Design a protein with these regions (language model features):
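Long, hydrophobic alpha-helical segments
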Residues: 14-17
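A short beta-loop-beta micro-motif enriched in histidine and acidic residues
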Residues: 72-76, 87-101
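Ligand-binding loop in jelly-roll beta-barrel domains
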Residues: 60-63, 121-122, 130-154
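A short, N-terminal "cap"/entry segment at the start of jelly-roll beta-barrel domains
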Residues: 22-75
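Short acidic-glycine-tyrosine-enriched beta hairpin
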Residues: 67, 114-130
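Recognition helix of helix-turn-helix/homeodomain-like DNA-binding domains
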Residues: 1-12
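Glycine- and acidic-residue-biased ligand/ion/polar-headgroup-sensing regions
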Residues: 96-114
Length: 154
């Protein structure tokens, strides 16, 4: 995985980054952002748009904004996913029992999980196993956005 990341062949999930950071003894919040957006005691933490970390696919057609706090990585992750026309976000299987929930906010996308594929339009949500090879595509002419939630097994 490290070799693939270094060669820009894959984008790691937050869970993978979290495990790597723990193995290396590095604070993931410091790695991804100077302002981790932690919750102050008794207050509301506001994370400015410039402080939200983002991952881009090697071809630049897909962007994942990491909306969830780093301390939940490996349990729950949520992202704002933007895919340009013709873009594909392909993923290898995550650990057994992992589920993804994709809610299309604008445009249209298709989801493939294993051998099954479904098309989604604005406002629709797909829930699917992510412990098999899976991909999210934008086959339309316009940019599409979605909320992607990854739930890891307990």
């Amino acid at each position: 995985m490290l070799s693939q990341i270094e060669r820009n062949l894959t984008n790691p999930t937050v869970a993978v980054l979290w495990r790597l950071a723990n193995a290396l003894g590095v604070n993931l919040a410091d790695l991804l952002s100077a302002d981790a957006g932690g919750r102050p005691a008794g207050g509301i933490a506001l994370v400015q748009p410039h402080a939200i970390p983002a991952l881009k696919s090697p071809d630049g057609h897909c962007e994942l904004k990491i909306l969830g706090p780093i301390e939940l990585a490996g349990r729950f992750e949520w992202y704002e996913l933007t895919i340009q026309s013709g873009g594909v976000l392909a993923s290898e299987p995550h650990e057994a029992g992992t589920q993804e929930h994709l809610s299309v906010l604008s445009g249209a996308m298709s989801v493939q999980a294993g051998a099954e594929e479904r098309k989604l339009r604005h406002g629709e949500t797909a829930r699917y196993a992510a412990d098999v090879p899976h991909a999210i595509r934008n086959g339309g002419k316009a940019t599409a956005t979605a909320l992607l939630v990854v739930v890891h097994p307990a």
